[in-house]
């Protein structure tokens, strides 16, 4: 089955890495459905996808919303072949100061939503005996980071989830993998001062930060036929910041 005849769903597709992934998928001839939490975000998705797909509002903190919206997608006869769990948030704080809400929101969006999104598409993938599930992890899920207990826990949790799901559907033509970025160019990194920037850079053997395009390239590969024998894996894209 050729990738260009597929339909992909990308969460958090209105900006940054999600937008880059969605654009690259659409350039491959894939119909892309992108999610955002705002009306303006949906407009952005519709604008850059044009005839190659569309956007819709989805609140990943709300499990009822996920189930309802995904049911709507299925009723419109869209069968998801490729699921990209890209959306994620941070809410940094030391454990002694971290509120329940800061913990719960990060876990809900970064980990729990991946469970619900994957569950919402897995039956149709099994029926077709074809599917690609690719989730954006983080080097922090392996290294940990001071002030990011919630974020680190959410990204670490993805590892066990994907390995287990990969085992469950390995004989069904479905692959389940993670792309784990290191330090990449985002709107957040633009606000770092010189000291902070150099501190991050000192941890990277390649002595440069990565780009959204480099992360997206790994996602596109895992979504393709060329990666049909790869499952339950984490592809690290971090310039040598973390090596397995």
Swiss-Prot record:
EC number of this enzyme: 1.1.1.100
Catalytic activity from the UniProt record: a (3R)-hydroxyacyl-[ACP] + NADP(+) = a 3-oxoacyl-[ACP] + NADPH + H(+)
Leading EC class: oxidoreductase
Gene3D superfamilies: NAD(P)-binding Rossmann-like Domain
GO molecular function: 3-oxoacyl-[acyl-carrier-protein] reductase (NADPH) activity; metal ion binding; NAD binding
A Pfam family it matches: adh_short_C2
Binding-site residues, Ca(2+) 3: 233-234
Cross-referenced CDD domains: BKR_SDR_c (cd05333)
Alphabetical list of InterPro entries matching this protein: 3oxo_ACP_reduc (IPR011284), NAD(P)-bd_dom_sf (IPR036291), Sc_DH/Rdtase_CS (IPR020904), SDR (IPR050259), SDR_fam (IPR002347)
Keyword Transmembrane helix in annotation: no
Keyword Calcium annotated: yes
Amino acids binding Ca(2+) 2: 145
Any one Gene Ontology BP term: fatty acid biosynthetic process
Positions that bind NADP(+): 12-15, 37, 59-60, 86, 151-155, 184
Binding site for Ca(2+) 1: 50, 53
Pathway given in the UniProt record: Lipid metabolism; fatty acid biosynthesis
Binding of substrate, residues: 138
Swiss-Prot/TrEMBL keywords: Calcium, Fatty acid biosynthesis, Fatty acid metabolism, Lipid biosynthesis, Lipid metabolism, Metal-binding, NADP, Oxidoreductase
PROSITE patterns documented for this protein: ADH_SHORT
Functional description taken from the UniProt entry: Catalyzes the NADPH-dependent reduction of beta-ketoacyl-ACP substrates to beta-hydroxyacyl-ACP products, the first reductive step in the elongation cycle of fatty acid biosynthesis.
Subunit structure: Homotetramer.
Miscellaneous comment text of the record: Calcium ions stabilize the structure, and may inhibit FabG activity by obstructing access to the active site.
Family of this protein: Belongs to the short-chain dehydrogenases/reductases (SDR) family.
Protein name: 3-oxoacyl-[acyl-carrier-protein] reductase FabG
Organism, scientific name: Buchnera aphidicola subsp. Schizaphis graminum (strain Sg)
Protein's gene: fabG
């Amino acid at each position: 089955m050729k990738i260009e005849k597929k339909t992909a769903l990308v969460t958090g597709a209105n900006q940054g890495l999600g937008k880059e992934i969605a654009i690259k998928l659409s350039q491959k001839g894939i119909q892309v459905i992108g999610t955002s939490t705002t009306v303006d975000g949906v407009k952005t998705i519709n604008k850059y996808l044009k005839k190659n797909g569309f956007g819709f509002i989805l609140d990943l903190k709300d499990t009822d919303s996920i189930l309802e919206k995904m049911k709507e997608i299925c009723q419109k006869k869209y069968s998801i072949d490729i699921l990209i769990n890209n959306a994620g948030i941070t809410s940094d704080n030391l454990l002694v100061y971290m509120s329940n809400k800061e913990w719960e929101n990060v876990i809900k969006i970064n980990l729990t939503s991946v469970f619900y999104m994957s569950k919402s598409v897995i039956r149709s993938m099994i029926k077709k005996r074809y599917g690609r599930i690719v989730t954006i992890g983080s080097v922090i899920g392996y290294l940990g980071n001071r002030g990011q207990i919630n974020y680190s826990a959410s990204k670490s949790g993805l590892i066990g989830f994907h390995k287990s799901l990969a085992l469950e559907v390995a004989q069904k033509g479905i692959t389940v993998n993670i792309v784990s970025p290191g330090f990449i160019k985002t709107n957040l990194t633009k606000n770092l001062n010189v000291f902070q920037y150099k501190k991050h850079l000192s941890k990277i053997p390649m002595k440069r930060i990565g780009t959204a395009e480099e992360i997206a390239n790994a996602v596109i590969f895992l979504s393709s036929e060329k990666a049909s024998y790869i499952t339950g894996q984490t592809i690290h894209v971090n310039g040598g910041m973390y090596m397995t």
